[in-house]
Amino acid sequence: MSDKQATVLVVDDETRSQDALRRTLDEEFRVLTVSSADEARALLLRQPVSVILCDQRMPGLTGVEFLKEVRERWPEIVRIVISGYTDSEDIIAGVNEAGIYQYILKPWVPDHLIDTVRQAVEAQGLQGDMHRLDLELRTSTPVLRQRSSQKLASAQSAFNFERIVRAPGSPLDAVCEVAARVARYDLPVMVLGESGTGKELLARAIHYASPRAARAFVSENCAAVPDNLLESELFGHKRGAFTGAYEDHAGLFQRANGGTIFLDEIGDTSPAFQVKLLRVLQEGEVRPVGSPRWIPVDVRVIAATHCNLESDVHAGRFREDLYYRIAGVTISMPPLRERSGDLQPIAAKLLEQVAQELARPGLYFGGDALAAMMAYPWPGNIRELRNEIYRAVALSSGEEIRAQLFSRKVLHGQPGTVKRGPHVQTFPQSGTLQERLDAIEAVVLKEALLRHRWNKTHAAKELGLSRVGLRQKLLRFGLEEK
C-alpha cells in the first residue's frame, strides 16, 4: 500500500452491516459508508475510492447492477460484492457481468475479508502495472520501453529474497537460498506452510527472480472460490456459456501466459476440479467454459497449501498424479514460532509500515511489548502479528507501544494450548473427565471468538448458542477480551 490509507466505500442499506464492516476494516483502511446506490454515485463524483464493498440485496438496484454501472463509469475502482446467495450460476453471472474482483458469501470471516480488501488495493497498484507491461514492451516508443523497464525494476526491487524480512542466521536463509536456485529453472514449485507464514511473498520473489519476471504474476486463493466459479476464473468462459455470461472472459491462465500463476490453498480443491487442472498442466492448454477450442498457454505454476498433501494423497483426498505434476520442487516455510529470532525485525518492519499508513511517525515498541511478543507463539504467524500491531497502534495515544495495548490472547496465550500445525491441538492429559471437557470447551470457545474477532453474536451463531448462553460460558471460563 501507499503511504496513505486506501479508501473503501461500503454500500449497504442495513446499518448493522455497515457498522460491522467498518469495525472490521477501519484499523487498516479509510472506510466510508452509504446506504444506497444514489448516495454512492454522489460520493464517487466528489472523491476517489480504491475499493467498493457492495451488498447484493438493496432497494432499487441490486449490488451487481450498481457495480456494473461503476465498472462503466469508474473502471479503476476494484469491485467486491457481498451476498447470502449460494447458487453457483448466480455467483458466476454476477462476477462476470459487473467485472467483480471477488464475491464474498455471508456470513463473512473478518480475516478473509481484510485479506481480500488488501489484495484488491494491491490490484490497483503494482500488479495492475505489471499486467499492462506486456503491451508496453511491444511498443516501439522508447519512452514507453523505458517506463516498462522501470516498472519491472521496481517490481524486482519490491519482491526479492532480500526483502523477505529476517534476522541474520534465520531458518529463512536456507529457504531463500533454495528458492533463488529454483527460480532460474522453469520447474513447478510447491510451497508448504501454515497460514500467514508468507507463502505468496516467497512465490512473488521466485517469479521476479526468474526469466519470466517481465511477464504477469497472477494469484488465486482456491479455497475462497466455489468450484464452478474457480473453473471460470482460472480457465475463462465464452459468452452464453451460462446464465449471465454476457461476454467472453479470459481466465487467469491466459492472463498469466508467459508468466507465473500462484495457486494458493490448492489442497482444498475438489477431486472434480483436480482432474480439470491436471489436464491443463499436462497438455499446456486451457478450454474456457462453453468453448469447444483449446487455447495453448505457457505458464509456470507455483502452488501452496497448509495441508499435508502426501497424507492427503495416501488418504485419497488429493490426486497422486496432480501432486507429482505440481510438486517439482517442494519448499517449506517454517512458522514464526520456529524462528523466534525473526520476530523482532519483522515486528519492527510491520510497525514502520503501519505507522506510515496511519500517519503516526516516531512509534516504537516498549520493552514489555517486545517481551510479550516473544512469549506468545503466534499460531496465526505474520498475519496475526500484523493484526495485533494494527490494533496496538490504533489504541495507542503516545509514541511508545506498550504490552497493555495487545489483545488478551497475546497477553495470556499459553504455548501448550495453541495449534502447532494444521488441525493439531494439545489438551490436558490429566484431571477428571469434567475438568478435561471444560478445558476442551474453553479452547473451542476461544477459537470461535478469535475467528470472529470477538464478535459475540457471530461466535454464538457458529456455536449454536444464544448470546446470553455464550456470555455465561465466557464468565464461567474467564474468557473476555481485554
Swiss-Prot record:
Residues where 4-aspartylphosphate is found: D55
GO cellular component: cytoplasm
Keywords of this entry: Activator, ATP-binding, Cytoplasm, DNA-binding, Nucleotide-binding, Phosphoprotein, Plasmid, Transcription, Transcription regulation, Two-component regulatory system
Location(s), subcellular: Cytoplasm
Main location: cytoplasm
Family matches, as Gene3D superfamilies: 1.10.8.60, 3.40.50.2300, Homeodomain-like, P-loop containing nucleotide triphosphate hydrolases
DNA-binding region: 456-475
Coiled-coil spans in chain: none
Name of this chain's protein: Hydrogenase transcriptional regulatory protein HoxA
Biological source species: Cupriavidus necator (strain ATCC 17699 / DSM 428 / KCTC 22496 / NCIMB 10442 / H16 / Stanier 337) (Ralstonia eutropha)
Encoding gene, per UniProt annotation: hoxA
